[in-house]
Amino acid sequence: MNKKFWLSLLTVVMVTSLLAACGGGKENNSAGGTSAAGNEGGKEDKVTFTYFNAAAGKDKNTNETTIGKIFEEQTGVNFKMEHLVGDENTKVGTFIASNDYPDVIVPGSSIDKLVGAGSFIPLNDLIDQYGPNIKRVYEPYFNLMKADDGNIYFLPLSAVTGEYTSAPNIEQGAFWVQRRVLKEAGYPKIKTFDEYLTLIREYVKKYPDEGLTGYLSLTTEDKFFAFTNAPMHLAGYPNDGGIIIDMETHQANDYADDDITKRYLQELNQLNAEGLFDKSSFVDNYDQYLAKLSSGKVLGFFDYRWQAGQAMNNLREASNKSGNDDLEYMALPIVYDENTKDQYLDPPSFVNNRGVGISVSAKDPERIVKFFDNLLTDENQILSNWGIKDETYSVDENGRFYRTEEQITQTNTDAFRESFGFKYFEYNWPRYGNGSTLPDGNSVGAGRQPEVAQMSYSEGDKKLLEAYDIASFSQLFSAPDERPWYPAWSIPIDQGSPSQIFTQKKSDLQRKYFPKLVLASPSDFEGVWNEYIGEFNKLDVKQYEELITDEVAKKIANVKGQ
């Protein structure tokens, strides 16, 4: 298939777009915003604030990156960025106990704990006074952002502006398999979990002396959901967290004790008995997990692309040098049963329990809000996502953004992404959410631009796409059904409440029993499962399910403006 054919197909796939749910894509939040010079005249003195991101990463000053230096020139503001080492709850607990915080915090699952402890300042008045761009981007979502007391304590990361554009490639969860496995089998159409595991078993059987790992799991404390979420996806549901929402009744069901969870664990138990499951999955840290994926020895795994991205980028760099993409992975929409519709792709959504907050320790919150506001111009969102014209992206005669092969190779290199600042500024700051478009029709995210997707495909990519008769990798997956509440995991749960205590006890129970269930001899599996269920039944799951059901109903009403 020639380049023109690919581009036309991808353009049809991606230009046909939906207005984002939850008020996304409304005209009132699609204008370009106040100029990047800011909304006040005159330059202020330079200042450095502290910034903590509850995710792994390399500590750095923002002005040590190309993008961050430009932002410092615009605003006089630099941030000393610190990233998480160890356990998030332990780190956040230290902040709370000392009442001494970084100026800016980007929490993960601890965000409810920080809000409950009064760690963040209210932003309402600051937005009114210093945040015209913040208001333009976020105002359609204000009813979803306010706490029970009416205050806004953090700015979420998923406010869609303009029309919603779906991703051509898989950005979220999937069952991944090495390309050489598909090639060896003649590029079969794989849908069920049984077919997926059979594919892996047959490849290992054919190459027994290569030291291959059939299946690997990510189970670190802060990423354990990558292990527990798999049964939900196999049953045909999207990532609502540890809960399934019925499409008709909107009733919530915790599936931790359901057959779909038992079936997944039992399949892994059998893989382990055959020597195909990596036992170290339950003790490896995140870096060790990424190293194993990068090694080329792991045939299959379930995870979210954004968690395994560093390893996948490493593999792409290696294949670019060698010209052989056998060790790269392809995402598959695997489900348990042939007649189940997969739902891996996220519907348009607004995640209102993740974001960026200003702490009570911040000495100059007005200056920080001005910096945030300055980020939210079209000009600076282009800088954060595309970079600098004629250096990291180009523009054709019709005003369409694209990247040359050289620019794509450069901007996909991990070291360059770090030094330029893409790695820091594409996410974890106030931003136009994934799927946003600019007023001129260009995608905010370079990866969702049809021209970039087409040019990014290697010869190996194109061979795979042709083999499966698709124009982009996401076409292998079913379109997402509308879910106004999505994602349910964004529903805030009060610290110390019965529901929060339940989720913590459930998590502790899963961490204790799931390794046992996978590593037990197959003859002992039923006994260990029954022991686990006995302990699970002591927990108050009913009140948790009732809470989520009620909150889902409220979110649906808010989204629909009822």
Model-derived regions, located:
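Sec-dependent signal peptide hydrophobic core
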Residues: 5-14, 367
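Conserved small-residue motifs centered on glycine
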Residues: 383-515
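Helix-loop-helix "hinge/cap" segment bordering the ligand-binding cleft or interdomain interface
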Residues: 151, 156-225, 246-301, 356-398
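Carboxylate/His-rich catalytic cores and anion/metal-binding grooves
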Residues: 119-146, 200-203, 211-250, 300-320, ...
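Conserved N-terminal structural module of periplasmic/extracytoplasmic solute-binding proteins
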Residues: 2-8, 23-195, 207, 238-244, ...
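Extracytoplasmic/periplasmic substrate-binding proteins
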Residues: 55-62, 161, 169-176, 183-189, ...
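C-terminal motif of bacterial Sec signal peptides marking the signal peptidase cleavage site
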Residues: 17-21
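Paired acidic/hydrophobic, glycine-rich loop segments that form the ligand-binding mouth/hinge
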Residues: 102-106, 299-304
